[in-house]
Amino acid sequence: MKLHIGPGNTYLPGWINVDIFSNVRADIYSSALALPYERETFELIYASHVLEHFSRHMILAALTHWRDLLSSGGILRLAVPDFEAVCLYYLRTRELKNIMGLLYGGQDNDLNVHKVSFDQYTLTEMLEKVGFNEIRKWSWQETDHANYDDYSQAYLPYMNKEEGMLMSLNLEAVK
């Protein structure tokens, strides 16, 4: 089975879609920190632009919970705003208004706030700390959900996938 945490407007058919917000399409409504599943239930867990919404003190707890839900050899596929790419974009363009959402979240409700930033080194270190291995970047074009637009495909200038810079750090790790 495959679990999609925080689908927002991107419901993935054939997956179990879990969101905390009842105003989006999901199969289950739950906190991502207390998912109602047995250990080793899933072969793949996907969370696109979810992890940055937890306080930095809860990141390892979230990663540990998700690891426990994976079967042996299962994959955790993450997408988070890429702090390094965001900084490079800002230094090249000085367009702060274009990166506000990536840095701070949409802020249209109390939960849509980014509380932590990630770069590849830091997220890799956290994944290793909770027992993941084979940590690698993944390409949104090469997944079974490539045709479903979500923030793993976030580019600046906005959605310029040919000439823009990818603003999402896409990492996956094996249990």
Task: Enumerate the predicted regions with their spans.
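S-adenosyl-L-methionine-dependent methyltransferase catalytic module, highlighting the catalytic core
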Residues: 58-71, 75-174
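Conserved SAM-binding loop
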Residues: 2-88, 121, 171-175
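Short, flexible coil/turn micro-motifs enriched in small/turn-prone residues
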Residues: 1-3, 100-101
